[in-house]
Protein backbone atom coordinates (compact mmCIF):
# COMPACT_ATOMS: atom_id res chain seq x y z
CA UNK A 1 0.00 0.00 0.00
CA UNK A 2 2.85 2.42 0.82
CA UNK A 3 4.27 2.13 -2.71
CA UNK A 4 0.88 3.04 -4.21
CA UNK A 5 0.52 6.00 -1.86
CA UNK A 6 4.07 7.14 -2.69
CA UNK A 7 3.13 7.12 -6.39
CA UNK A 8 0.15 9.37 -5.65
CA UNK A 9 2.38 11.75 -3.68
CA UNK A 10 4.76 11.91 -6.67
CA UNK A 11 2.05 13.72 -8.61
CA UNK A 12 1.95 16.48 -5.99
CA UNK A 13 5.70 16.75 -5.44
CA UNK A 14 6.58 19.26 -8.24
CA UNK A 15 4.18 21.86 -6.86
CA UNK A 16 5.63 21.58 -3.37
CA UNK A 17 9.21 21.60 -4.64
CA UNK A 18 8.54 24.79 -6.61
CA UNK A 19 7.89 26.48 -3.25
CA UNK A 20 10.96 25.02 -1.50
CA UNK A 21 9.23 22.05 0.13
CA UNK A 22 8.88 18.33 -0.31
CA UNK A 23 6.07 15.95 0.57
CA UNK A 24 6.05 12.33 1.74
CA UNK A 25 3.79 9.69 3.24
CA UNK A 26 4.35 9.29 6.97
CA UNK A 27 2.47 6.97 9.30
CA UNK A 28 -0.25 4.75 7.83
CA UNK A 29 -2.94 3.56 10.24
CA UNK A 30 -5.01 0.72 8.76
CA UNK A 31 -7.97 2.05 10.75
CA UNK A 32 -8.23 4.86 8.20
CA UNK A 33 -5.64 7.56 8.92
CA UNK A 34 -2.68 8.56 6.77
CA UNK A 35 -0.08 11.10 7.79
CA UNK A 36 1.30 13.31 5.02
CA UNK A 37 4.52 15.12 5.87
CA UNK A 38 5.29 18.52 4.40
CA UNK A 39 9.05 18.90 4.61
CA UNK A 40 9.89 22.58 4.80
CA UNK A 41 13.17 23.50 3.11
CA UNK A 42 15.32 26.39 4.37
CA UNK A 43 13.87 28.74 1.74
CA UNK A 44 10.31 27.41 1.80
CA UNK A 45 7.44 29.76 1.07
CA UNK A 46 5.12 28.89 3.96
CA UNK A 47 2.62 31.51 2.82
CA UNK A 48 2.31 29.59 -0.47
CA UNK A 49 0.66 26.58 1.20
CA UNK A 50 -3.08 26.19 0.90
CA UNK A 51 -4.92 25.77 4.22
CA UNK A 52 -4.27 22.39 5.84
CA UNK A 53 -7.93 21.33 5.78
CA UNK A 54 -8.06 21.85 2.00
CA UNK A 55 -4.73 20.09 1.57
CA UNK A 56 -6.00 17.12 3.61
CA UNK A 57 -9.17 16.95 1.48
CA UNK A 58 -7.07 17.03 -1.70
CA UNK A 59 -4.81 14.17 -0.54
CA UNK A 60 -7.76 12.15 0.79
CA UNK A 61 -9.58 12.36 -2.55
CA UNK A 62 -6.45 11.23 -4.40
CA UNK A 63 -5.74 8.35 -1.98
CA UNK A 64 -9.24 6.91 -1.59
CA UNK A 65 -8.83 4.44 -4.47
CA UNK A 66 -5.80 2.89 -2.77
CA UNK A 67 -7.32 2.92 0.72
CA UNK A 68 -11.15 2.90 0.51
CA UNK A 69 -11.45 2.96 4.32
CA UNK A 70 -9.51 6.24 4.48
CA UNK A 71 -11.23 8.52 6.97
CA UNK A 72 -8.65 11.20 7.62
CA UNK A 73 -5.40 12.65 6.34
CA UNK A 74 -3.25 14.38 8.94
CA UNK A 75 -0.89 17.07 7.63
CA UNK A 76 2.39 17.37 9.54
CA UNK A 77 4.85 20.17 8.79
CA UNK A 78 8.49 19.34 9.44
CA UNK A 79 11.30 21.87 9.43
CA UNK A 80 14.96 20.86 9.02
CA UNK A 81 17.22 20.66 12.03
PLM feature spans:
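Domain-level signature for proteins that mediate thiol-based redox and metal-cofactor handling
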Residues: 1-81
Amino acid sequence: MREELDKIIEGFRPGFQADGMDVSVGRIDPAGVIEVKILMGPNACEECLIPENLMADMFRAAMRDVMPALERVDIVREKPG
